[in-house]
Amino acid sequence: MTRLEKIYREKVVPVMQKEFSYSSSMQLPGIEKISLNIGLGAASQNNKLMEEAVAELSAIAGQKAVVTRAKKSIAAFKLREGMPIGARVTLRRDRMWDFLDKLMNFALPRVRDFRGIPDRGFDGRGNFTLGIKEHTIFPELEVDRVENPKGMNITIVTTAATDKEGKFLLDQLGMPFRK
């Protein structure tokens, strides 16, 4: 059991049970998965950029990233169906908890002028998405070796029914939301 999962089970669960007065422990919201995505439009012309993105995303996540390909051809973007346009990885169980711990305690505080995450990223069903402008904030990547800093999307999928429950869950786990 990871450090953050232990905090969830021992501290967050009783607080949420009291706050929302659930009748069953199965109603308690939890984190289902974390999805990481890097979109690279320029990678359709530059294959080296795509390989670099996959390697870096794999290092950040701790498991192999998958290349995402274009579903449709779009002439204005010089894009053909099947061309590589990004990379993604889905984390579950222990890797998910480890990544969330690393994100909240190491990566986000390394962002320049960090004052917390805005809570606008909730989707109405308790899931939270945030964008990062530079992926070099993660400790696995050496800033000197990264040629092209890339942005990425991080989606935290919860079993919470509402945004209020989802925000409370992430807040109790230590997500640094803006006050």
Curated annotation (Swiss-Prot):
Keywords: Ribonucleoprotein, Ribosomal protein, RNA-binding, rRNA-binding, tRNA-binding. InterPro entries: Ribosomal_uL5 (IPR002132), Ribosomal_uL5_bac-type (IPR020930), Ribosomal_uL5_C (IPR031309), Ribosomal_uL5_CS (IPR020929), Ribosomal_uL5_dom_sf (IPR022803), Ribosomal_uL5_N (IPR031310). GO terms for cellular component: ribonucleoprotein complex; ribosome. GO terms for biological process: translation. The keyword DNA-binding does not apply. Pfam families: Ribosomal_L5, Ribosomal_L5_C. Gene3D superfamilies: 3.30.1440.10. One of its GO terms (molecular function) is structural constituent of ribosome. Coiled coil: none annotated. PANTHER family: 60S RIBOSOMAL PROTEIN L11-RELATED. Part of the 50S ribosomal subunit; part of the 5S rRNA/L5/L18/L25 subcomplex. Contacts the 5S rRNA and the P site tRNA. Forms a bridge to the 30S subunit in the 70S ribosome. This is one of the proteins that bind and probably mediate the attachment of the 5S RNA into the large ribosomal subunit, where it forms part of the central protuberance. In the 70S ribosome it contacts protein S13 of the 30S subunit (bridge B1b), connecting the 2 subunits; this bridge is implicated in subunit movement. Contacts the P site tRNA; the 5S rRNA and some of its associated proteins might help stabilize positioning of ribosome-bound tRNAs. Belongs to the universal ribosomal protein uL5 family. NCBIfam families: PRK00010.1 (NF000585). This is Large ribosomal subunit protein uL5. It comes from Desulfovibrio desulfuricans (strain ATCC 27774 / DSM 6949 / MB). The gene is rplE.
